[in-house]
């Protein structure tokens, strides 16, 4: 991420610059005093979004394309993808506004909210009330993000942009599925998230296998694919283990394992134990494939699970926080110190060459992921 402290200095400048551009653009649009909802107002907003995106692209050509500065490139990539995809999506929104029937949309929403339980019939009724121009909006939003992120990655080969493109790709697939069969996506959301996470994880493995020594941009892209895959896999695995494949909207855990303290004590304790078991499996996989991203993404959930367990000791809030941080910090430091020796033990039974060695690289390669 860093070549030297100059990268941090430049990144701070980039963040300040685009924060100012965003606020300035909003103020400029307001100063035009255009009629709200008019074509000229929409055109001005789209133009301002596109201009900020183009500025991010221009700086990327200098900082990423020529100077290969990774950390500023991550910020610029995010700015470009957000503003460019918003501009593209806004164009579609403006085109369909003339066909938008608010009464039909309200009726479609009411057909879902008026039912006490999710059913395929309710979703079918909702779809029947919505025109295709509205139903396709998720695909347009997801497709815009995918096209923009893929364009950035193909232009600058920034590893972060590659990971973001992978995330946009699986998100686009999920949104397309949502348009075709919303009931299945909503009802079986934990299973869908697991499939998305597995797709990103396998993509990361594919990039890693092409660079087992972890020395090129390929492994950098693999890192970010693992980084984006890990939260999906962890949340989906914990939710599946506790609530099953179907989404449970009434349980706070249905939103994610980090909300386990909001559940009943017995349920929270069970969720904490399951979470730690899943995280332990993730840690084992991380050691085998030499990727810390799977562990890093689970630190928050690990901390929450440990806090739930420590809370059983009857300590006050400060005591729970102190013990949790001590245990969590100790685990991270221990993994950092013993990473290579433990990997040496775990990878010893595996071959040191061939296809398996590209997926589970031996310690002899020396580089850490």
What are the language-model segments listed below?
Residues 1-369:
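Alpha-helical multi-pass membrane segments and their bilayer interfacial helix-loop junctions
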């Amino acid at each position: 991420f860093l070549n030297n402290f100059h990268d941090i200095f430049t990144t701070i400048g980039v963040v300040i610059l685009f924060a100012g551009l965003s606020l300035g653009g909003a103020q400029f649009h307001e100063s035009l005093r255009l009629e709200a909802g008019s074509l000229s107002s929409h055109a001005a907003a789209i133009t301002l979004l596109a201009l900020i995106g183009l500025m991010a692209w221009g700086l990327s050509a200098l900082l990423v394309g020529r100077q290969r500065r990774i950390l500023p490139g991550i910020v610029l990539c995010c700015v470009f993808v957000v503003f460019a995809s918003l501009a593209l999506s806004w164009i579609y929104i403006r085109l369909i506004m003339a066909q938008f029937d608010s009464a039909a949309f309200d009726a479609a929403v009411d057909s879902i909210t008026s039912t006490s339980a999710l059913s395929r019939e309710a979703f079918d009724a909702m779809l029947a009330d919505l025109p295709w121009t509205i139903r396709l909006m998720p695909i347009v939003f997801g497709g815009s993000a995918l096209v923009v992120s893929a364009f950035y990655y193909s232009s600058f080969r920034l590893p972060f942009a590659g990971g973001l493109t992978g995330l946009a790709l699986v998100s686009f697939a999920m949104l397309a599925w949502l348009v075709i069969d919303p009931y299945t996506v909503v009802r079986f959301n934990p299973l869908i998230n697991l499939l998305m996470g597995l797709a990103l994880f396998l993509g990361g493995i594919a990039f890693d296998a092409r660079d087992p020594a972890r020395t090129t941009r390929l492994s950098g892209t693999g890192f970010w694919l693992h980084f984006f895959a890990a939260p999906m896999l962890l949340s989906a695995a914990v939710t599946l283990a506790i609530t099953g494949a179907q989404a449970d909207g009434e349980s706070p855990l249905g939103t994610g394992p980090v909300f386990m303290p909001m559940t009943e004590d017995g349920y929270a304790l069970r969720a904490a134990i399951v979470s730690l078991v899943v995280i332990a499996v993730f840690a084992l996989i991380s050691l085998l494939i030499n990727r810390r991203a799977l562990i890093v993404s689970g630190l928050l959930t690990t901390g929450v699970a440990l806090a739930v367990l420590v809370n059983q000791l009857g300590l006050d809030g400060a005591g729970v926080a102190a013990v949790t941080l001590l245990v969590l910090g100790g685990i991270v430091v221990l993994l950092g110190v013993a990473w290579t020796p433990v990997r040496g033990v775990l990878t010893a039974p595996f071959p040191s060459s061939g296809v398996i060695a590209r997926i589970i690289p031996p310690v002899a390669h020396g580089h850490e992921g």
